[in-house]
Amino acid sequence: MPFFLSYKIKSLIIGEDRAFALLSQEFSIIPGLLGEYGRKEIYRLTLNECTSDCSISFGTIFSHSDCEIKEGVYIGANCMIGKADIGKNVLIGSNVDILSGKHQHSIELVDIPIKYQKGKFKKIGIGEDTWIGNHSVIMNEIGKGCIIGAGSVVNDSIEDYSIVAGNPAKVIKKRK
């Protein structure tokens, strides 16, 4: 609870988004079972939804509190997760990035640096019973029962029960 109280105080001073980012970074580097338990508990208090039976590994950072983590979710080490709705029994490998859409940065105005241009953030849905392989980048919706091959870049929506791989990710076959 002291961490949550610290988060609430920081929220009043530096804003909720920045305070959440700092909290997520702090908890990402706590090793072992203590870290896993601590991450789960702090995210149950700060994310839109986080169930008690999820597993969030070392080095994983959430950039926004606008996330839902459903029952039975496993998130591997060193992941970066933006706005996301992660369905039941999803497996996310290590070093996976789930971006808040594929248009987080605008580039239209050449007289304004890209970092100052407003982007569009989108909550990314990941359907239940999906497995995302290591080192994948997710920028769009993934249906239920999908398998995303390691190193894939998902920039278009993926239909239910698809097996995809590559950059950009393409359907290899359907599970059903």
Protein language model annotation of sequence segments:
Residues 1-53:
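A transmembrane-helix-recognition feature enriched in membrane-embedded lipid enzymes
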